[in-house]
Regions:
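Conserved hydrolase catalytic core segment
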Residues: 25-69
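Acidic catalytic loop of the alpha/beta-hydrolase fold
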Residues: 168-172
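Alpha/beta-hydrolase
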Residues: 82-152, 159
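Flexible "cap/lid" loop of the alpha/beta hydrolase fold
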Residues: 53-93
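Active-site loop/oxyanion-hole signature of alpha/beta-hydrolase fold enzymes
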Residues: 1-34, 209
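Short alpha-helix in the alpha/beta-hydrolase fold that links the catalytic acid
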Residues: 159, 173-182
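Catalytic active-site module of serine/aspartate enzymes centered on a nucleophile-bearing elbow/loop
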Residues: 187-229
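Short beta-strand/loop motif that positions the catalytic acidic residue
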Residues: 157, 163-165
Length: 229
């Protein structure tokens, strides 16, 4: 199997097969980061089987505006002692050659993804428990997922949608999340203060409180809209 064989259609079909295996008619889906694009695509391809979405520091497109925003947010941290090595690794076109090199790469760029780098050590056990695959990383680059831009189709999303983002996420930023919010009718936007790309790690109390409140609000709004139709 070649990396190019893995398409959004294939991933959406796999998700739907899992839904059927679980015996569920409709499912809520949550996607973090690039997985946000996957769950959005599922909602577009299988609207009758998607009950709602949680887009968590999610991405659905890349364009010049989002790239400029990311670069600006990166440069805001250029005086940090770890920045030069992290930025060099993040922008490098060279692919790690071994699993050890891949792990070193992840550890080098990780400070960029946190609001407070002290939280990296506090969450070390979570990162250690996360499976990493160099082959999967290479495959994701070769399948050119970044060329899939769902921006023009977001108006088609018609399920309850909660959009949550860390205030200092540089790669799936508040600007990007707000653009999603403006395109998805009836969606709710929540900002997790003092958090980066992993807000549930850095601000767990704030994150879970706001997400629970946000889910209740978006579901109540959906029921209200149905009743007044």
């Amino acid at each position: 199997v070649q990396p190019s064989d893995y398409t959004y259609d294939q991933f959406a079909a796999d998700l739907d097969a899992l839904r059927q295996q679980l015996g569920q008619e409709r499912v809520w889906l949550m996607g973090h980061s690039e997985a946000g694009r996957h769950v959005l695509y599922y909602a577009l391809q299988y609207p009758d089987h998607c009950a709602g979405l949680i887009l968590l520091d999610a991405v659905s497109f890349q364009d010049e505006r989002s790239h400029t925003d990311m670069e600006m947010r990166l440069r805001e941290r250029q005086h940090e002692p770890w920045f030069d090595l992290a930025y060099q690794a993040f922008t490098s076109q060279e692919m790690p050659e071994s699993e050890a090199d891949f792990l070193k790469f992840i550890q080098t760029i990780l400070p960029l993804y946190y609001y407070d780098v002290a939280n990296i050590q506090l969450n070390a056990s979570h990162h250690a428990a996360t499976s990493m695959s160099l082959d999967a990383f290479k495959g994701s680059a070769q399948c050119q997922w970044h060329k899939t831009n769902l921006m023009s189709r977001l108006k088609e999303i018609c399920v309850p949608t909660l959009i949550a983002v860390g205030s200092h996420d540089f790669i799936c930023s508040p600007l990007h999340a707000h653009r999603l919010h403006m395109e998805i009718t009836g969606s709710k936007f929540i900002l997790i203060e003092r958090a980066g790309h992993f807000p549930w790690y850095e601000q767990p109390d704030q994150f879970f409180t706001k997400v629970k409140e946000g889910l209740a609000a978006v579901q109540a709004s959906t029921w209200h809209n149905l009743l007044i139709r």
